[in-house]
Amino acid sequence: MNNYFIILASGLSKRFKSNKPKQFSIYKNKQLFEHSLDKAINSKLFKKIILVVKNKKELKKKYTDKVHIINGGKERSDSSLKAINYIKKFNPTNVLIHDGARPNFSNTLLINLIKNLKNSIAVIPTIQSVDSIKYKINNQTYNLDRNNCYLTQTPQAFNFKKLYVLAIKEKNKVKDEATLFINKD
C-alpha cells in the first residue's frame, strides 16, 4: 500500500458567499473537510494523508500521525503543487486528490479508484450531465449535447510519477489535475 490522499482545504470559497470557507462549515457536527479526513483514515487505504489548509496554526484539533498538515498556496493549483512536492520525498505510487468541501464519497469509490489505477495513469470519477449546457464563444451561444457532457468529481486518482511530471511542467495553468491528463495517452 503506497497510496497517498491529499485533501485541499485552503481555498477561500469565494462563490460560497459566507464569512468562512465552505470546507469549515459544520455538517453533522463536524467541519466538512473532517468528513473526508475521517473517511480517508478509516479506509486504511493510505500510507499518509496530507491536509492542505490556509494556515495550519489555526487548526486546533490533533490528528493521527498518518495525517500531515501543510499550508496551501494562493490558488487551488498552488496548494495542489505544494502537496505534490511535499509527498515526493515519500516516493508514493498513487495519489488521490480531493476537494475538502466535498464530503460525499464512499469507501467503495476509493477502492475502485485505486484498483483502476493498476491499468491507468489517471482515474477520474464523473457523472453524466442531466442539465442543458450552453457554451459561449465571442457572443455566439451554442448548445452542447448533454449526452457527451460529464461533470468531474473528486477524489481524483493518479499515478504519482506521471502526475508529478505533468504538474511541474504545467505549474499553475490548471484548475483541476484531471486537466493535465486529457488526451495524453
What are these regions (language model features)?
Residues 32-92, 170-173:
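Conserved N-terminal catalytic core of the sugar/cofactor nucleotidyltransferase
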